[in-house]
Amino acid sequence: MWSGSFSSSYSCWKRTWVTLPIGLLLLVIRTWPRLLHPEVWQEDGTYNLPGFFQNGLTDLLEPVNGYLIVVPKMITMLSVSISITQYPMISTFLACGVMLVVFYIVATAPIHIHGGILLAAACLLLPSNPEVFGLPLYSFWWTSILLFVVVFWNANQNDWILRAVIIIMASLSSPVCIATLPLLWVRVCFLRKNPREISLTLLATSCVAIQIWIMIHSNIYVVSQINIASFYLIITKFIGSYAIGNIFPMFRWYFGLFILSLLIVTVLRDLRSPAKWGLAYLLCATILMSISRLSINHLHQAIGSPRYFFFPFIILSWFLLQIALTETSRLLRMGALFILCLSILNAIPVLDRKHDDLNWATHLASCPHFKEYELPVHIDGNIAGTWALKLTKQQCNSLLDKDPFFKPAVTGGFPFRVIRKHPDDRPFEQNDVTVAINKVQPGNEWLGADPQKSHKNGIVVLGSFMDSGAGTGSLTLKMRRGDKLLYRSGLLRSGQFIEVQAPLFRVTTSPVAREWVQLDFSNDLLPDEFSVIFSDRSTDWHEWSAIMLKAD
């Protein structure tokens, strides 16, 4: 007996040490930019963090975008409780840890679909932009995969506790539980003499009921109107694009029809296969869920909300693996294997996703020196368009005082804070500028404006843009602490600088501002009076800067 137990334990360890390194390698290939330069992203910075600061642990039950996301909020709460300055790194690594756990369970779970580690590898080799890879907010996309696994779990295994935990955590983190519940009830019809299966299905039903209740009462969950006339696009976007959409998109129709025919023939050849019927149902269900959230006309696996291809591509990969591994027809096996290999090549153009550095730590160091501060939060990885996490001076001090990793900076951080207007807000007016044109010092080299030649009553625009963004030069202003001006720039900023001539402050790369933003020079470490030099040192046509000052 001891020998058998030892053999089983050895086999488990061997399986672990084979599975996890493969998963880690694939994860790093897809997420290395986020691991090297972790940032705060989307609703994680605008909902989850503020919600935890205000409500504590009870914020776990607050919906985001209309539904519960318990797992991402747990990552957020744990990470920020450890350190606010290191929050991007800690939360990113925890999110990647969730991905590895999902990879391991998919690779080793006793399920009725074949593939093992190939099923798990398929999840990390999807031919779509890795939007949901390595982000704490999107970790629920990964835990939701385990609901697909539970559907095909071998009922003879004595691991109901693990399945119960999966059902609770995944169902309370994603509406996908609504799609998988019917399959669990189908299982019960075949396993009605198994009380554990009945109990697990009732547990799943309870979780789905909670999720649906939240979705109904939040009045936020958005459902896009499904256009029946556009259904034909499913073949090209969700099936053809899987094989060839990133490398030869002009052939998506041909490959879409080929793959669809392959799936249909396989199901018809084995009508009594629960696994194939289950995968066919999940493929249809996940596609319908995707196009119910956003119009299919706006979806694209590389540039148009690629997260909505995540589940359909996973199920399609698993379906093709079943054909390649179990089909008796050599022709069908070779066809499925060809598409799977082609999909890996198709993933190469979208293997990783790079993003701009937002200097989270420097912004946090600046935060205590302003009455209020807006920490930038990524939307799509482009610094030109960000959201903001708004904190008061008191909140910043409280968070940093509890942070074991925080060390007071030897510099003053940013001398100014950037205030951006939401499109629905009133535009900036003359009263939002306190610096007059007579504060410009002799030797001004900014003799242009911005490309649109912006004009407001009582305001003067000075900029480095002449006939193009290739103009260079500098402008010096005499300012006082608390002064405000408006600023705008091109999409590039490598040669744009703002230098405050005061102790504790270094030369700062200018912010990217496609629209006018306010620069508020109210850092309490600034002297009463100081000079600021705005410089454009780049001859690139896309680089320029401009400021708005009062006319008198």
Predicted regions span which residues?
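Intrinsically disordered, polar/acidic, low-complexity terminal segments
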Residues: 2-129, 158, 162, 186-187, ...
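Transmembrane alpha-helix segments characteristic
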Residues: 21, 271-297
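Hydrophobic/aromatic-rich transmembrane helices and adjacent perimembrane loops
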Residues: 140, 300-325
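Membrane-interface transmembrane helices that cradle and orient dolichyl/undecaprenyl
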Residues: 148-162
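Transmembrane helices and adjacent periplasmic/lumenal helix-loop junctions
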Residues: 165-186
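Perimembrane helix-loop-helix junctions
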Residues: 180-206
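Short beta-strands within extracellular/lumenal beta-sheet-rich domains
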Residues: 454-484, 493-496, 516-519
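Extracellular carbohydrate recognition and processing domains
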Residues: 501-545
